[in-house]
């Protein structure tokens, strides 16, 4: 299970992700080769599209619907853990839809209900930039969470949507934890202690996620790991387990959200190398199963209720 992949943007831009390609990091055949059976697909609204964010996210949802309709035997949308299990049993990829950047709501809380009806079950408030909901990791404009951001979080929790704190500023992160209850996730964020970067989380933030029964998905982007090598990803997994415990670490590859390649993990088809690396570092099967999906599914079950 991968908590964050951006390939749906490629599909929306008319790249055929139903055929195996050497382009990018992923497509449907390579996801299968890599053993991914649950994929959270990011519906990313770039800041340049913020002025028509709701229209943009609807375009991305339409692109997913076309993909799913044309490939019914291969994948399906999952809005519950029970649906994930049914899709897994059928040998189909379970697709969880997640908005990246709350600018997708166009400043209207009611749009949350609209995207929920379309199958969206997770959302981050910002990307790197600040918006009308909160400050992002790379820009301070509001001093944290805004009143509108609080309204959005309230409605998300009423709907049973998963709150993703990746891309938030530190102040926004703590504000979100103060006004929400239950598990929170950071879908694609690493340990700042190993790789200092505003997009990574410090030890206290990681511990706070663990106290809330949440998870952090380790990001494969070399800028956030400290270098383009599988070993650096394994280092972050090991460190985050040390800080958070083995029940709170997951994977959030960010594949197709960055350029270049990671040695020994060049694309999603090479994910078995990560499993082998965990075995080589002495992790037992139970811990590896948690990292590869068990921890994230536990959070989904607690928030979704089924």
Q: Model-predicted segments: where are they?
A:
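N-terminal hydrophobic targeting/anchoring segments and the immediately downstream early-domain regions
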Residues: 1-142, 147, 192, 196-251, ...
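Catalytic beta/alpha-barrel core
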Residues: 75-78, 161-168
């Amino acid at each position: 299970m991968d908590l964050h992949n951006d390939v749906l943007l490629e599909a929306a831009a008319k790249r055929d992700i139903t055929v195996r390609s050497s382009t990018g990091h992923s497509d449907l055949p390579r996801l299968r080769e890599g053993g991914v059976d649950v994929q959270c697909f990011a519906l990313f609204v770039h800041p340049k599209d913020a002025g028509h964010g709701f229209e943009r996210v609807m375009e991305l949802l339409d692109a997913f619907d076309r993909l799913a309709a044309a490939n019914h035997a291969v994948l399906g949308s999952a809005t519950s853990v029970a649906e994930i299990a049914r899709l897994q049993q059928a040998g189909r990829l379970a697709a969880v839809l997640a908005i990246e950047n709350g600018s997708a709501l166009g400043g209207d809380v009611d749009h949350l209900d609209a995207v929920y009806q379309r199958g969206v079950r997770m959302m981050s408030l910002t990307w790197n930039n600040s918006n009308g909901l909160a400050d992002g990791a790379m820009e301070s404009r509001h001093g944290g969470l805004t009143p509108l951001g609080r309204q959005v979080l309230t409605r998300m929790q009423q709907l049973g949507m998963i709150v993703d704190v990746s891309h938030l500023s530190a102040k926004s992160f703590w504000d979100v934890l103060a006004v929400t209850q239950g598990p929170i996730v950071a879908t694609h964020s690493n340990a700042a202690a190993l790789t200092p970067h505003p997009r990574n989380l410090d030890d206290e933030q990681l511990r706070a996620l663990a106290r809330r029964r949440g998870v952090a998905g380790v990001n494969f982007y070399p800028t956030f790991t400290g270098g383009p090598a599988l070993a650096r990803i394994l280092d972050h997994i090991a460190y985050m387990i040390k800080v958070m415990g083995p029940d709170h670490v997951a994977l959030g590859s960010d594949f197709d959200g960055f350029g270049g390649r990671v040695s020994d993990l060049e694309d999603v088809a090479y994910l078995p190398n990560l499993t082998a690396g965990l075995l080589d570092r002495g992790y037992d099967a139970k811990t590896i199963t948690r990292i590869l999906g068990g921890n994230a599914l536990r959070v989904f079950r607690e928030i979704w209720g089924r």
